[in-house]
């Protein structure tokens, strides 16, 4: 009897890979499945994602590898920007195009009414999380209750819509429009679409969603899983942005060898030991480098006249 594994190529070992992959996630793939596939393609020893993106959404999914995982929480907290396609005239059972249409109504609004409605959602608002979401109630994801035909009480949550703009409007020819939304973490765009529909008096549901930015990271330079797979194995790690791509809001500080040694031991660096001209406000963050070429050592915070290490990296 032939061993079916005999003809398989040997599995290559994991390797140390550091950086952030700006992945353009395809439709229908969960964030976790995208992470598993990217980790396998890169043969990475350590990886983590920076917050989920619905399977029915496409677009930017930053994936952190190696030492970059130490900063993944920062992206979880960051604002997100989406392009959302909305259809007016009916709600749906899931809030998106996958659900059964409910409460079909006539659409009598025009572009001006849509623009006015959108403006009303800028700022801090309250949202009731949708039943078809991963948010947990009594230890179970809400979508499990929804699949069982149950509706449970959900507390409203406060989120912030930083900006919202009408990109395209098919009215009056077709009852649909596309908006660009920048919002705080935890915002449900499908719920926003439904609430806009109610404000317009005709109901609405989401028909498409694409994330175009997470904090300062954008789709510019993002790659697909197919593009990674097409690269030679040895070239794939070069598709990652460096760890400090996550730290661009931090002030760069270059230390000399002596100060760098103390910094890596967790010691604070006094202002007098920083490069001449270094100006850091109290409580501000710095990304710290040393050597030639410069190597990232970590992140520090300025407190009481000294730079204090907060997170060190080993690159």
UniProtKB/Swiss-Prot annotation:
<dbReference type="GO" id="GO:0003723">
    <property type="term" value="F:RNA binding"/>
</dbReference>
<protein>
    <recommendedName>
        <fullName>tRNA pseudouridine synthase B</fullName>
        <ecNumber>5.4.99.25</ecNumber>
    </recommendedName>
</protein>
<dbReference type="InterPro" id="IPR014780">
    <property type="entry name" value="tRNA_psdUridine_synth_TruB"/>
</dbReference>
<keyword id="KW-0819">tRNA processing</keyword>
<dbReference type="Pfam" id="PF09157">
    <property type="entry name" value="TruB-C_2"/>
</dbReference>
<comment type="function">
    <text>Responsible for synthesis of pseudouridine from uracil-55 in the psi GC loop of transfer RNAs.</text>
</comment>
<dbReference type="GO" id="GO:0031119">
    <property type="term" value="P:tRNA pseudouridine synthesis"/>
</dbReference>
<dbReference type="InterPro" id="IPR036974">
    <property type="entry name" value="PUA_sf"/>
</dbReference>
<dbReference type="Pfam" id="PF01509">
    <property type="entry name" value="TruB_N"/>
</dbReference>
<dbReference type="InterPro" id="IPR015240">
    <property type="entry name" value="tRNA_sdUridine_synth_fam1_C"/>
</dbReference>
<dbReference type="GO" id="GO:0160148">
    <property type="term" value="F:tRNA pseudouridine(55) synthase activity"/>
</dbReference>
<dbReference type="InterPro" id="IPR015947">
    <property type="entry name" value="PUA-like_sf"/>
</dbReference>
<feature type="active site" description="Nucleophile">
    <location>
        <position position="54"/>
    </location>
</feature>
<dbReference type="InterPro" id="IPR020103">
    <property type="entry name" value="PsdUridine_synth_cat_dom_sf"/>
</dbReference>
<dbReference type="InterPro" id="IPR032819">
    <property type="entry name" value="TruB_C"/>
</dbReference>
<keyword id="KW-0413">Isomerase</keyword>
<dbReference type="Pfam" id="PF16198">
    <property type="entry name" value="TruB_C_2"/>
</dbReference>
<dbReference type="GO" id="GO:1990481">
    <property type="term" value="P:mRNA pseudouridine synthesis"/>
</dbReference>
<dbReference type="InterPro" id="IPR002501">
    <property type="entry name" value="PsdUridine_synth_N"/>
</dbReference>
<comment type="similarity">
    <text>Belongs to the pseudouridine synthase TruB family. Type 1 subfamily.</text>
</comment>
